[in-house]
Amino acid sequence: MLSSLSPYMANPRQTFTQVLNFALVLSTAFMLWKGLSVYTNSASPIVVVLSGSMEPAFQRGDLLFLWNRSPRVDVGEIVVYNVRGKDIPIVHRVMRTFPDVPGKDKTKKGGKQGVEASPSSLESQKLLTKGDNNLSDDTELYARGQDYLDRKEDIVGSVRGYIPAVGYVTIMLSEHPWLKSVLLGFMGLMVILQRE
């Protein structure tokens, strides 16, 4: 094994160039992801459907493209949200929207009741979601004490397109961590052993 690596160790300039090419590929992928995040106004502009709660609209493993530049979300629109305190994207349909009425009791962060809404807090829309394949709405999935989603705080983006089954690769990699190590090791070896 080490004897097969000796030609690469003999020419450090070529080895350095190959490592630099690998770093260039990684940094380009990172820059494309960040550029797409800025363009869509979403921290995660592409997500994979992880469960069957949205069948038949989306299957497990479908790759979704998100857009988060619309100020409002309509009933019937499919959104991706994160539960407060957890970083698990959930893909469900908006079933109902709630207007933010001034003078009503509001639940603020920390669960404090009885604080009136200020005019600046009226800008964020409140949403209730449900999976197409679920029997009830998502109030059980929300954080403790949360009865609805806040458009600005909880929504990652609205679904604007999808590619079926492409995301199944990421599901396999997350369900089998050893597969991720094997794949990364194989890719690293291919870059190092590649001849120009």
Curated annotation (Swiss-Prot):
It is found in: Endoplasmic reticulum membrane. Residues 182-193 are annotated as: C-terminal short (CTS) helix. One of its GO terms (molecular function) is serine-type endopeptidase activity. It is an enzyme of class 3 (hydrolase). InterPro entries: LexA/Signal_pep-like_sf (IPR036286), Pept_S26A_signal_pept_1_Ser-AS (IPR019756), Peptidase_S26 (IPR019533), Peptidase_S26B (IPR001733). GO terms for cellular component: signal peptidase complex. GO terms for biological process: protein targeting to ER; signal peptide processing. Residues 101-133 are annotated as: Disordered. The chain crosses the membrane at residues 15-33. Glycans are attached at residue 134. Residues 34-196 are lumenal. Keywords: Endoplasmic reticulum, Glycoprotein, Hydrolase, Membrane, Protease, Signal-anchor, Transmembrane, Transmembrane helix. The active site is at residues 53, 92, 138. Its EC number is 3.4.21.89. Disulfide bonds: none annotated. It comes from the Eukaryota. Belongs to the peptidase S26B family. The C-terminal short (CTS) helix is essential for catalytic activity. It may be accommodated as a transmembrane helix in the thinned membrane environment of the complex, similarly to the signal peptide in the complex substrates. Catalytic component of the signal peptidase complex (SPC) which catalyzes the cleavage of N-terminal signal sequences from nascent proteins as they are translocated into the lumen of the endoplasmic reticulum. Specifically cleaves N-terminal signal peptides that contain a hydrophobic alpha-helix (h-region) shorter than 18-20 amino acids. Component of the signal peptidase complex (SPC) composed of a catalytic subunit SEC11 and three accessory subunits SPC1, SPC2 and SPC3. The complex induces a local thinning of the ER membrane which is used to measure the length of the signal peptide (SP) h-region of protein substrates. This ensures the selectivity of the complex towards h-regions shorter than 18-20 amino acids. SPC associates with the translocon complex. This is Signal peptidase complex catalytic subunit SEC11. The lineage of its organism: Eukaryota, Fungi, Dikarya, Ascomycota, Pezizomycotina. The gene is SEC11.
